[in-house]
Design a protein with these regions (language model features):
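Outer-membrane beta-barrel "beta-signal"
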Residues: 182-185, 323-333, 349-360
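Short loop/turn motifs that connect adjacent beta-strands in outer-membrane beta-barrel proteins
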Residues: 25-30, 57-64, 90-95, 140-142, ...
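Sec/Tat signal peptide C-region and signal peptidase I cleavage site
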Residues: 20-24
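Bacterial N-terminal signal peptides
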Residues: 7-19
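N-terminal secretory signal peptides that target proteins for export/translocation
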Residues: 1-5
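Gram-negative/organellar outer-membrane beta-barrel architecture
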Residues: 26-33, 39-177, 272-275, 336-339, ...
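Hydrophobic, well-ordered secondary-structure elements that form the walls
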Residues: 283, 300, 326, 340, ...
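C-terminal outer-membrane beta-barrel translocator/porin domains of Gram-negative envelope proteins
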Residues: 82, 169-171, 179-308, 312
């Protein structure tokens, strides 16, 4: 099993004691605070807390706004703290999202490409801050324009003095500043932003990192994310997603497309595989079990490559992902939920994920 966080204690507490802390009430805003406990080989014991607040609008035309605080610390004196807001205006005409984070947290590195061997595993610790702000403006109906800016400033410390990341041959091995300007368009007619049951989501976003934007590196990226939701009745839904990422220019190693996260290609350690380009697709079946408790089953696959044409090559390696999960709805009149997913990837890799709201 790869070194993915395993917050078992949190998963148990979420599924056994959440209802009492999120009891239904008539106020427009709901808040909950939960403990965090986990472990990983590179961190030892992890502990902390998260606070989540959702404001439910009084009209159906306005989508709910949220805010989250998260803090964790580990037995090896590593830490992560972030604040995140997602604010919708009346009628969902404007949307503003912001994220601010400081971390000193280890991540694995195996090299580049889909053939990076397990034996090449080493760890590096980025220390610093990252932040982003995205503005979304409705043009007409479900069509939005999207613009934003992202910035990070990290110092990277490799775990091994003789490892690959100790060599300046790998771009970005010492860290540095990355500033990116983002522009895009979005079609979004989903019925709910937390756990959609019908509708579609299609977003194309281009980003450019360059010196005028505060970046030490010059590269560009195009991300296309498409989702569709098919209602099957009685609280059941089939969710579909396809994602493509293409990167050009001189991108540092930590800005490449990565396999392994809590949203798609679950079951791999974060960054287990990385390259310039990525294509992935997944399907997820979601259903209600009992009252606020639900379950999900998902399967997907993806590829990474140094250029787009290689993604379609017959000899390219396909990375599988599949698993099951539980869901607990937080509030009686909202679909916001806590999800606990167990996923498996290729070659015996697996991971347990605890997160707010659906993966997509």
């Amino acid at each position: 099993m790869q070194s993915i966080m395993r917050p078992f204690a949190l998963a148990v507490s979420l599924l056994t004691g959440l209802s009492a802390s999120a009891a239904a009430q008539e106020s427009a805003a709901r808040t909950f605070v939960l403990p965090y406990l986990g472990s990983a080989p590179e961190t030892g014991i992890q502990y902390g807390a998260t606070a989540f607040r959702v404001r439910l609008p009084s009209d159906s035309a306005t989508r709910p706004s949220t805010a989250q605080l998260f803090a964790s610390y580990t037995g090896k004196r590593q830490a992560r703290v972030f604040a995140e807001v997602d604010r919708w205006s009346a009628g969902s005409v404007w949307r503003l999202t912001g994220h601010l984070e400081w971390k000193r947290f280890p991540l694995p590195f195996h090299g580049f490409g889909d053939a990076a061997p397990d034996a090449a595993e080493e760890f590096y610790t980025p220390t610093g801050v990252l932040g982003s702000m995205i503005v979304q403006r409705r043009v007409r109906g479900p069509l939005y324009l999207v613009g934003g800016y992202g910035y990070q400033d990290f110092r990277i410390t490799p775990s091994a003095a003789d490892g690959a990341l100790a060599s300046d041959a790998i771009l970005g091995n010492r860290g540095g500043r990355v500033g990116q300007l983002q522009l895009g368009a979005l079609w979004d007619d989903r019925d709910d932003v937390f756990a959609s049951r019908r509708g579609s989501f299609l977003q194309a976003t281009g980003s450019n990192a360059a010196r005028p934007f505060g970046s030490e590196y010059a590269f560009r990226r195009l991300v296309v994310d498409g989702r569709h939701f098919v209602p099957l009745g009685a609280g059941r839904v089939l969710a579909l997603q396809a994602v493509t990422e293409m990167t050009g220019g001189e991108a540092p190693f930590d800005q490449l497309s990565l396999v392994g996260n809590s949203n798609y290609l679950r079951g791999y350690a974060h960054g287990r595989y990385r390259d310039l380009d990525l294509a992935a697709a997944q399907a997820e079946y979601r259903a209600r079990l009992w009252r606020r408790l639900g379950w999900a089953a998902f399967a997907g696959a993806g590829r990474i490559a140094p250029r787009p044409a290689r993604l379609l090559a017959s000899g390219a390696r396909t990375l599988p992902s599949y698993g099951i999960g539980l869901r607990h709805t937080l509030f009686a009149n909202s679909r916001s939920n806590i999800r606990v997913d167990y996923a498996r990837g290729g070659r015996g890799q697996s991971g347990l994920y605890v997160a707010l709201n659906e993966a997509f």
